[in-house]
Design a protein with these regions (language model features):
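Short, structured segments at the rim of ligand-binding sites
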Residues: 1-226
Length: 226
């Protein structure tokens, strides 16, 4: 990206040298945030009839969280690039088991693990050591929500957790948003699995995604403030 702005960048094993460069490209588009797309892709994973368009996102991305493409494909999504962005389609071929190391993509853990729990997918996950250090202790949040879905989530090692398969989904769950924007948005998307979700302390989405609730309504989700 810096080279596209005309900078001269020299990389060595221990040093990055940036020199004054030439003229940047006439126009540079900024790619949307892949981590925000994780909530919509979790909804697509949970709903077998889903097809969503992620505007201005492409499979060829420099963002680490674009690992969502690999995750999505393993969890039954098919991706198609079009001019407007990226279409994700649920193929109805969800696996019975899924494993992933979230060390490089910690913000994806919440929505993906919850989607697996809602879909009845068993899993083994690693790279979760940083989750208690986020806006809330997200491991506690995951454990509570997973249990409310009728599944289990137990620690098996340092940063390693195992997800057991749920039984029957409940008709409705209540989630404490913990003042954590990602807990709130991940929990809200569980409604794509066909259950009612009451989210307490939901205002925190304004930190990273102020238009989240309006976009949910525009996408056909129904909700009301209690």
């Amino acid at each position: 990206i810096m080279r596209r702005f005309g900078m001269v960048v020299e990389l060595s094993p221990k040093r990055i040298t940036i020199k004054k460069g030439g003229k940047p490209e006439s126009s540079i588009s900024v790619e949307p945030d892949w981590s925000s797309a994780s909530f919509w892709l979790s909804a697509a994973i949970m709903n077998r009839d889903s097809e969503i368009l992620l505007y201005d996102l492409k499979q060829d991305s420099m963002q680490g969280d674009s690992a969502l493409i690999i995750i999505g494909e393993e969890l039954g999504l098919d991706f198609t690039n079009i001019e407007e962005g990226l279409i994700a389609t649920n193929t109805g071929k969800a696996p019975s088991f899924f494993s992933f190391d979230f060390s490089d993509t910690p913000d994806l853990a919440l929505p993906i693990i919850l989607a697996c729990a809602a879909c009845g997918v068993e899993g083994e996950f690693s790279g979760l050591s940083s989750q208690p250090l986020k806006e809330s202790d997200r491991l506690v949040a995951i454990e509570e929500i997973v249990c409310s879905l009728g599944a289990g989530f137990v620690k098996t090692g340092e940063g390693q957790w195992k997800l057991s398969r749920r039984q029957e989904l409940p008709g409705q769950i209540t989630v404490n948003g913990r003042g954590d924007h990602r807990v709130v948005m991940s929990a809200a998307m569980l409604s794509a699995a066909g259950i009612g979700v009451i989210v307490e302390n939901y205002y925190s989405v304004s930190k990273s995604y102020p238009g989240f609730w309006e976009q949910m309504r525009q996408s056909g989700f129904r909700g009301e403030e209690l």
